[in-house]
Amino acid sequence: MRKQRLLNDIQKILTLNLSIAASFWGLNTQAFAHGGKAEMVSLYQNMSEQGAKVVKDDFTNTYMITKGSMVVRAKPNSDQVLINGKPFKLSVPLLVKDGKPVIGKDFFNEVFQSGLDQTFKIENTFHPLNSLNSDEIKKTFDAINHSKYAYKNMRFAELKLKEPEKAKVWDYFINHKEYTDARIASFILLKGNQAIEGEVNLNTQQVTKWNVLKNTHGMVLLDNFEAVQRVIETSKEYQEALRKRGITDVKKVIATPLTVGYFGGKDGLDKQLNILKVVAYLDVGDGNYWAHPIENLVAVVDLDKEKIIKIEEGAIIPVPMANRPYMSNKPVPNKLKPLTITEPEGKNFSITGQTIHWGNWCLHVALDSRVGLQLSTVTYKDKGVKRKVMYEGNLGGMVVPYGDPDIGWYFKSYLDSGEYGMGTLTSSILPGTDAPENAVLLDAVIADYKGQPQVIPNAIAVFERYAGPEYKHHEIFGNQDASEARRELVIRWISTVGNYDYMFDWVFAQNGVIGINAGATGIEAVKGVKSRTMHDSTAKEDTKYGTLIDHNIVGTTHQHIYNFRLDMDVDGENNSFMHMDPVVKANDKGGVRTSTMQIDSKVITNEQNAAEKFDPSTIRLLTNFNKENKLGNPVSYQLIPFAGGTHPVAKGANFSKDEWLFKRLNFMDKQIWVTQYNPDERYPEGKYSNRSTHDTGLGQFIGNNENIENKDLVVWMTTGTTHVARAEEWPIMPTEWVNTLIKPWNFFDNTPTLNLGEDEQNTQHDHH
């Protein structure tokens, strides 16, 4: 203790001396630079104005300043700073005056225009898949607003780039052919129980398509959140239901707008009405209203009339009132010593427009308002040749079905992307916690529900990481060691849908493997119950459909089922789907062995036979029989829907076959689907999934049972977890991951990481 006090006293003396020195040099907010006085300004204020973030590390007395891919570390009274780990000399040092850091007024220009950041390159030609920019979104809205179709209060479920012709995009990207087609904006408007699909030619700024779809329910939009809150706050009937539960201040009630599903009319709801159900929570001031559910009270809200048309009630359950904040309530949080990632020579990747180059990989990234992060024109440069791997890859759709039949739960089967728009709900990524400090954070522009551009800061993170040894071999007799470190490039996107936060990582390895990882975190949707412990007489019934994770709170058992749409083009567009099964066969060659291991292979020829459960013992390949490696093997990529995770795997939907959910969403029960490419088939749950009465997605896509042999194919991989709640996930849930892989299979001639170097060097100069 004495030693610690002594160290603390020494630290105070040093800090005082530094402050005195800084005050001397910072007199009248000026310091000397090149023999003259320099004007000094506040570090925090100036950097904030420039869009940079400042964090002080008290342990090392260092200021870390970040903007984009630039990381600057500066110590008080030193004219030497580190920019991305590389030394740089300032004309004026950072000083401390009256306990506050100050810098020369030219600090930002001096540091951030130092030329040490080579991450971003100028895009010489515009990639055809580049997202609509702010100006194009405004032009689209203006074209609609000035057309004969315009009406007041237009509400947009979607406004984005119409997919250009695939063959022309590949020609641009692979063959460097000029792309001259006009850019077209497509949009979806919602008007009552109608959806309006349209297009605008951005060259002519004319509406070229206007198609009204009747009896069609679209997504839940942001103004719906506001509308249901207004409705419950003005409903006397709802307030009376609250009073029965001891709640007198409706302003403390938080409404959540939930889609109602479809149950063949058995729920008594009119299919034609534009409605949502409202389940509410009580704000008790602890910052976590999710911990205070108002159980067994559901309001059915007519969105067009903005009124409650029905209140569904069950037995009164007291609202759990114990404070359960999920923000740290410690006065001083546990402080770990800094873990610093430096890249002293800059990034190993570069970004040209929306195209990322890393080693032999090249790919385009965008943010879609519905499905979020979208990768396209994914290629791998092998021996100087840019080889196609995937035209487009993204989350196709997902569903979160709950297994509780009670009044406030039976309808909960959220189609997060199809009903709420996960791209619209993108969560800005925080450096140092959501992604490493060395990550490059990219903003994205999408259209909001009013048809206006919305900038989402830090929407996508891109970073490189060490991922263990790529390979290792040591010769026992001799001094030879073969060892190579594995590097991965991670592209991360996060979406917050109500209580849950979903993280999606696309992970590229130098050896050609692509991982797609989905992580669930945030706060569990919980049910209020009477039981405090499992020893209570009510506990058995209260936990019939979940786990008691706190006093009076049950985490209800549910699933997170993800489907990824992968438009694979393995070394070209014409691919086939095949199985390879390792089998035991009798030894017919003689000798002491009675059995052998051999491989049975077969090609799956149609879409319906390709829809199947995942058996990890079967090797599933997307194969290009028109291309071979040097040994004569056809080139392939292996498809692995479940490659590990931290929650129990969802082998399929945990529902009986007579459930309406099964009739509407076939995709959730099988893990592999392969269809012929069709640009209009984009969502496994169907384009308009809200209140759908039957499967308008993958179940419909394979209805014509097209041939899939040597065709342009799309793979739909379903994966997910069955979430059985546990106390360690409350009040906030550690991120739980499920992993998928697509993996080269005889795609290369040998170990691809032995061929690094020349190809990677050439790739650095290829910014098309």
Name these PLM-found stretches.
Residues M1-D9:
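N-terminal secretory signal peptides that target proteins for export/translocation
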Residues K12, N17, W25-T125:
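Primary recognition of N-terminal secretory signal peptides and signal-anchoring hydrophobic helices
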Residues E49-N84, K148-A185:
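N-terminal, post-signal-peptide region of Sec/Tat-exported proteins
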Residues K53-T60, V72-L82, G115-I122, Y151-K152, ...:
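Extended intrinsically disordered, low-complexity coil regions enriched in Ser, Thr, Gly, Ala
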Residues P128-F173, L221-G265:
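Short, non-transmembrane alpha-helical segments in secretory-pathway proteins
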Residues K139, L202-V220, R243-R245, D283-L373, ...:
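Extended effector regions of multi-domain proteins
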Residues Y151-N203, D249-L303, G359, I491:
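Exposed beta-strand-loop-beta-strand "reactive/processing" segments of non-cytosolic proteins
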